[in-house]
Amino acid sequence: MWILIYLFIIWSSLRTWVTAVDSTTTVGDDLNETVSASVWPTMSPQMTVAFRSQRDVMGNLTIDQLPYVGLNLRRVLLNNETSMVNEGNNTRLLTLFKSMLSSEANAFVLDLEQYNNDLRVVDTTLLFSDVLIALQSFIFSTQNNLYANIIVLLLNISAPELDSTEYRHQNQTLNTTYILDKNLGNGFIYKPTDLQSDRAKNNTWNIYGKSSIDGWPTLGSVLYEQKKRLVIGELTDFFNETTAPYIFPHDVFHYEQGNSTLDCPSTVEGLTDLSSIHWRFLDSLFNSVDIKEYISCGLSPIISNSAYVNNVTQLADIIHEGSVWSWDSDQPSVTQSTSKSGSSSGTLEAYNCVLLYYFANNETVTWRVGNCYNSNIGLCRYENMAFRWLVRSNKATYFDFDSYQGSKCPDQYSFNIPRSPLEQRSFIAYMRNSSFSDTQIWIDLNSISVSNCWVSGGPYASCPYEKVISKRNFVTMMVPASVCSFALLCIVVYLSVLRVPIYDNRKNWRRVINKISKSELEGVPS
């Protein structure tokens, strides 16, 4: 019986241990997991964490207001300077395209032409279906909360040289729905019908709040609830709603080439007006300096630098400068634990909270990791107003600035963070108008729960990639169970080895009992 109890205890402890290990997602271990990129430079663990945390911060932004960094594939990949095009090396072209998908680029302009009731990539023998198969493979390999992101595919369709009757006939016989269903699958595509459904359910927003007329769903809704990964749009006027129901028409997107006609806003009114324009793309030549400025002005750059096709590293640097608009160049620091420690001066240290550094001389900001136990001022936002900020003058540690006991932000304000380049630009305008000098400000972003998992929601926010328990709490949970198991084991061993004394002296007890029984009288007393 004791053996069975002991085995049950051991089984329970092992089950708890296995459950905890299986349920814990250590984000640091996932830093080394990268999508296959045989040509494109692999993202470092630091870049991976920065890009992922930035995506998570933008989770409540609508997909039309996200900052995309894209590539014009015909100019970058398929220009005349590319020997691959002249050689007709389709395999290498697809390999490079797959590598580009695994970079930080998340928008692509693809030029297609009609070819025998099919679509073919201009200046190549590649079919549109070949590109879709490569895209499907990438989406399958990244269909999880760690790596999933929205991809925008913008199509330039070249019409065949036919008279109007033949053109209209070929356009109607071209079955784009079949091509997309067969080679990609419609489950990953966010379609015009999905947008209509979201608007009917009042699940869309614009800059002013919920809107069923011109609103769009949030990134979190599209990625995690609907499991959609791809938005396909047309830049020409080749398709219609009947022939291409999966593709958004050209008038949905604000797409410009060369120079932008949109002014870079510097006031809240200008920022609000710009935000009312959906999907703002600028197709032009960029370098690693000016691309950050265009991003901060609310535009999504489409890189058309044909000279960089043979210098992939330089092109990758430009994409990185544009895609990471928040963190400093050497941030965030990749750590292995979140446990607090004491410095030589006796103060507590936990470098798991984020400070926004404001530099007044050039009016720039950047994010850096700071010690959560240091006292700093914090950033507050007014209700759901995207561009209305307040910096509190009273200093506090990260844990005290926004805690269960209350927030340091006043009523109708909440501890917050700039979620996009435009919101960060509005914050800079606020700091300039308020005549702030260089300063460091707490923002609502930390990795207190799990190392390298940067989340918003205050110091007690949990990591979305960790289901049950973290490494830090694992030892705390296992120690009591292990001690109890060891104590019960000792008791079981003791009872199994050491017999009860009455059985140990059985002969002596029998002799005593016999002696006593002889002195007893038999029969009934008279």
Curated annotation (Swiss-Prot):
Signal peptide interval: 1-20
Glycosylation sites: 32, 60, 80, 89, 156, 171, 175, 202, 240, 259, 311, 362, 433
InterPro entries given in the database record: Telomere_Capping_Maintenance (IPR051008)
Pfam family, one: TIM-barrel_MTC6
Locations listed in the record: Membrane
Keywords: Glycoprotein, Membrane, Signal, Transmembrane, Transmembrane helix
Transmembrane feature ranges: 478-498
Cytoplasmic topological intervals: 499-526
Membrane topology: Single-pass type I membrane protein
Top-level division of the source organism's lineage: Eukaryota
Family label: Belongs to the MTC6 family.
Function of the molecule: May be involved in telomere capping.
Protein name per its UniProtKB record: Maintenance of telomere capping protein 6
